[in-house]
Each structure stands twice: as C-alpha cells, then as structure tokens.
C-alpha cells in the first residue's frame, strides 16, 4: 500500500524533490527493484482479450499463468538495453504488526470476488475487468517463477528477511545501487536516497519515469527524518491505523507545530479527531483498572500478586512499533551483487518448453539480452546533461507557501511557550 497521500503532498509541498526524466537518463545506473510490486503490475497489465470480452491473464497449455513471466522477461531486457542494471528484491516474512493490513486486503478480495460474480451474471465486461484486477495477487508460485527466470537471465536476485522496500533502501544507502524502484512511497520512509517510480510502465511510447530525492523531501517539507517518519505514520501506512479525520495537509501542520506524534496526541481535539485505541493502549488499560476498582471496592492485582510479571508489550503504542520498523528494519548487510551472462539454453527451454512461449521470439529476445549484457559490462561514462528534465511548474509557488507555513508553525510554538511562562 505504501503511504496514503504522500505523493500528492510532496507534489504540493516539496515539488523540487520530484523529477520527470526519460528512462534512458538512468543509463549506467544500478537499481534495486521491488520484485513483488513488479510482478503484481505485470499480472494486471499483461492480458489478452478483445472487444466486449473480459481481459484475462496469459496462460500456457497447462493453464498456468504466464503474464508475470512475459512482463518480467520483456521489461528486464528493456532495462538492460537502456544500460540499466536491475537487481530484483523479493519480500521475506512480513512483520507481525502488518497482519491487520493483510486481513484488510483479504476482506477486500472477498468483496471483489462477490462483485465479480454479480458482474459476470449481468454480463458487465467493464466491471468484470475492474473486479478481476482487484483479485490479482502475486503468490509463491509467481515469485518462484520469476526468481528462476531472473537467475537464468543472469540478473541478481535478493530475498529480503522482511520487507523488500526496506532492503532495497538499505542497498541504496550502502551505495550498492543508485535507487530503489517501486511504486510504494514507504521506500522514502525507509530513507532510500533516490526513489524511481513508473519503471514498470516505461515502454517505447511512454519512456518517462519519476524520481524522488529523499534529501530534497526533508528539505522541502522543512522537517527532520524522525518527523518525516511520524508524518508518514499519521498519513497512513501498512503497520497501524491512523488518526481519523486528519488529512495530509493537517498531518504536516501538526508535525511542524508539535514535532512528534506523542505531542500531537496530547494537544489534539479528541472529540473532533478519533485517535486509535492502539495508539493509546495505556489509557484503555488504566480505564479498565479504574472500572475494576470501582466495582465493590475490588482492587486490581498488584505486580507482586502477578509474581512480578507485568505485560508491557501491549502497552507499546502501535505508532511506536511502526516507527521502530521504519528506523530499525531487519535487512541483509553483507550482499555482493553480480550480473552474469544468461544461461541461454536453459532460459530458452524454460520459456519455450515450460511456459509455452514462441521459440523465434524467445531466441530474438535472448540475443538482445546477450548484447545488452555485453554492452553493460564495458566501463561507461554517464552523460546526464544530455537528458532533459521536466520542471515542476508549482515549485516556486509551493516553496513560498512552505516557508510561510513553517514560519507560522514556529510562531505558534513560540506563542505557546510564552503563555506557559
């Protein structure tokens, strides 16, 4: 899911962090790509169908889905032909606190399944396409298929211990790659120096991609890294609920004024804005203990009566756990990235015999892959000045507004301190 509303907020409040560039401007760059995100997009985009027919995923003779293989094979060759060296990072085990988000996704798929049944019965092709895409999920088989494909292509594959975006960001911060390639905005929350979006959509007719610079995000929003993490949590992330009624602009205003979530909770109008119970678990526990004490004068068990054991885990606010995940995510540090020549014979066998691809097209694409590998293996000089960058028309206006808002927030804090004294 990423971070709700962050892309729009950055476009409005920190436009200098965003650049629209041509795919070829990334020539000579190594990019860590979120594999699960790419596979999901290929499953949605690579489909067959005609007029008045529901679009369906590509399959082989055995009925096995091959859309992800088709998309991954062609797009990886496109990257390498443009001089880009891709590294695909796969998700590991999701963090425990993400379970509530996974449950929500499952519920959404169940609703989509019911809506698809209705659309099919009514013969509504457009609605069938819409709901069938909502049912798409990159499962274990799709991930294993792509791991095998990429290995045969000679492209590095990394399996993260946890979230792929966090691992990709770590590779970027370590200088092993230039950027993280994903649509998920939480790559910025993990502090990837450069985020590249729209990579999966880039093709011959639409070659522009979007880059975001982390340092310019922080500079443009006029907040610190820790405040940015808290802002992202308030906007809405995969790891916890957020304050109901607080939109992106209000969240930024509150973080600028108060500095962190703890102080926001202390000062926010709780009648107007609903703070999740998981954010204030101590309040709920204290209320429960108070109610128990009020009933017939019965006191709650003391620490001594519980053999000195106090359940502190449930007292950790959800946003604190989310904050820790963003700042201390489990990643692999000892990684060596190697691009190798493709295993042409085994690759052709996998694509033609196992996946049912056209042999002539496969041979032609393998030749392109081999040529790209040979070209990319030579020392290369980047020529950034030759590539045009699309300027953001709102940059000057947003910069002035940002400075004014920051000044107001600073003045408000000073005023509150003066009143206290």
Swiss-Prot record:
Post-translational changes noted in the entry: Phosphorylated. Phosphorylation upon DNA damage induces relocalization to the nuclear plasma.
Listed PROSITE patterns: XPG_1
Binding-site positions, Mg(2+) 2: 184, 186, 238
Residues covered by region (I-domain): 127-258
InterPro entries the record matches: 5-3_exonuclease_C_sf, Flap_endonuc, HhH2, PIN-like_dom_sf, XPG-I_dom, XPG/Rad2, XPG_CS, XPG_DNA_repair_N
UniProt region (Disordered), positions on chain: 284-307, 398-421
Location within or outside the cell: Nucleus, Nucleolus; Nucleus, Nucleoplasm; Mitochondrion
A single MF term (Gene Ontology): 5'-3' exonuclease activity
Binding site for Mg(2+) 1: 34, 91, 163, 165
Domain of life (superkingdom): Eukaryota
GO cellular component assignments: mitochondrion; nucleolus; nucleoplasm
Region annotation (Interaction with PCNA) ranges: 379-387
Cofactor note: Binds 2 magnesium ions per subunit. They probably participate in the reaction catalyzed by the enzyme. May bind an additional third magnesium ion after substrate binding.
Enzyme Commission number: 3.1.-.-
Family: Belongs to the XPG/RAD2 endonuclease family. FEN1 subfamily.
Function as written in the Swiss-Prot or TrEMBL entry: Structure-specific nuclease with 5'-flap endonuclease and 5'-3' exonuclease activities involved in DNA replication and repair. During DNA replication, cleaves the 5'-overhanging flap structure that is generated by displacement synthesis when DNA polymerase encounters the 5'-end of a downstream Okazaki fragment. It enters the flap from the 5'-end and then tracks to cleave the flap base, leaving a nick for ligation. Also involved in the long patch base excision repair (LP-BER) pathway, by cleaving within the apurinic/apyrimidinic (AP) site-terminated flap.
Protein name (database record): Flap endonuclease 1
Name of the gene this protein is made from: FEN1
